Every structure is written in structure tokens, then in C-alpha cells.
């Protein structure tokens, strides 16, 4: 039995060596390669079970090692067989592109082609850099089908867009910024272009951002449906004003002699734009400037909004003076639109 095992292992390894030397660009050959790798580890696993320390002057790995490598070979063989049944089977595929090492490189369990280097300078320091790979093409599996998409880079990280226009980040720079930097900022350099850190806030001398349109809200249920927090606030008002039927009729006054308490009104600011940009903007505001607002929503959108990429976040303030300070001190990116007003709560 030992002699048979030795012969089969030798024949299997010869076939693997031949496939390496062939340097094929066809999926069928790479599938054959992983079949032989799988068989090789089955034979080595059996040899270890038989108590053998070496076969054909080759050290026999532990049971755990041969089992793990065998499972890896099965995983890649099945992935390549399904890829071979797709429309991408006529493309050229190299041994490296179908290797286990590249299969588990981010984005994991995807095939990748055309790697390019992007450099990130943490703390915007050219002596504190890291290099990452941006793949020209990413092949991902979803619901029984392979899709081919491109990778992109922005300030947040490296991502690809799915067929549903969803961004899937497989590298996020803020995570490494905590490890390699102290300021929480970085520059992204690629192809002669630099994406720099754009501060959320500047000194209060900065002019107020352009107001796109005033916000008029007369029904508290609309705001609640949108996920806006409902907390009572106090503000100044004219005691001669009538019932609060329409919030946009409220005109705050600074006359201390005419103070009254309204329990159902709060100043707010809507920021509207790309969902991922809003998420990063909210994160940076929470991190260092939470004193300039009282509360903030998650990203939300109106139910009749057909633009799936566009979202809104709403900031709530305890007073009109805090709202004014926010608008004066906030440096909102030009891609984000601003709406301010009041909301009944």
C-alpha cells in the first residue's frame, strides 16, 4: 500500500509541475491544477494517518496542514468551475490570478485583475506612508452569478460598485489612520493626483454656507417618519403670536423681556448629498464638534426619492443661536446642499 501511495503522489506532483511550466492562460488548466493540489493533500493526509514522516524523500505535513490545504483547493476548484461556466471563461487567466494568495487578498473570495498601487500619507506626512492595491477589475459572486466591475479610490478608501450601485469598500483608510497616525487625517496619492483632507470646520470667520431652500414643516408625523429625533426644546418667542399652526411663521426674537416656552419646536439643518459622504461627514462632526449641535439622525431619504445614492442627515439644535453658530462655523463641502429651518416635535 505504501508503494502505491508513493507512486500516486509522485505522478500527482509531476502533473502539478507540468501545469506550472505550461504557464497556461486557460481556466480549464487552472481547474486541473487545483484538482491535483487537492489530490496531493489527500495523499499526504493519508500518509500521515499511516504514521509516515516522509514520502519520496519529502516531509509529510501534519494532519491539520494537509486538511487545511485540501479544503483551500476544493474552494478554489469550485469557484473556478463556476467561473468557467460564465461569460468570462474566454478571458485570459494566469496562475497568479487564480492563486490562493490572490483569492484571499482584499476583496476576499473575489477574482482580481490589473493591480495598481495607491499611496496613503497618514497625518499628511510623506515619511508616514502605506501602499495599497487598487484592482482594475473585480469579479464577485452574487446569487448564483459572477459580475465584473471596476475598483475606485476616494478619500474614504478603495471600493467597487455592485450592479445595484452599492459601494463595497474593501479597504478603509480610517482604520489604518488609527494605527499609523495620530491626527486622523491623510492624503491619497494615485496617478499623479492627490486627494487631500478637507476639514469639516474652519474658524467662525468663514461665511455662512449658501442656503439652498428654507425648510417648512407643519406636521410632526412627517419628521418622525423620516427618523428625526423628538426631544423638547425651549426658545424665545413673541407672546402676541397666535397658535403654532405653521412652524415657518415663527420669528425668534432676542428681546429678553418677551421670553416664553415652546415645547414643540426645534431649529434644524438638513444636509443632503451622497450617502457615503454624509456618513463620513457625520462621523467627523461627532468625533470633534459635537458641542455645535444637540442631536443628529442617521442617513435617511424620502420614500418617493428615486435617487438611491442621495441621502439626508438632520441636525437638531437646542436654540437658534446654536443653529446659527453651526451654520457660521461649518465648512460644508460644495457637493452637500444645506436647508435650515424649524421642525415641530
UniProtKB/Swiss-Prot annotation:
Main location: host cell
PTMs per UniProt: Phosphorylated. Sumoylation plays a regulatory role in E2 transcriptional activity.
Gene Ontology cellular-component annotations: host cell nucleus
SUPFAM superfamilies assigned to the protein according to its UniProt record, in alphabetical order: E2 regulatory, transactivation domain, Viral DNA-binding domain
Entry's Gene Ontology molecular function annotations: DNA binding; DNA-binding transcription factor activity; nucleotide binding
Region described as Disordered: spans on this chain: 215-237
Entry's localization field: Host nucleus
GO BP field: DNA replication; DNA-templated transcription; regulation of DNA replication; viral DNA genome replication
Family of the protein in this entry: Belongs to the papillomaviridae E2 protein family.
Subunit composition and interactions: Binds DNA as homodimer. Interacts with protein E1; this interaction greatly increases E1 DNA-binding activity. Interacts with protein L1; this interaction enhances E2-dependent replication and transcription activation. Interacts with protein L2; this interaction inhibits E2 transcriptional activity but not DNA replication function E2. Interacts with protein E7; this interaction inhibits E7 oncogenic activity. Interacts with host TAF1; this interaction modulates E2-dependent transcriptional regulation. Interacts with host BRD4; this interaction mediates E2 transcriptional activation function.
Protein name, as recorded: Regulatory protein E2
Lineage: Viruses, Monodnaviria, Shotokuvirae, Cossaviricota, Papovaviricetes
Gene: E2
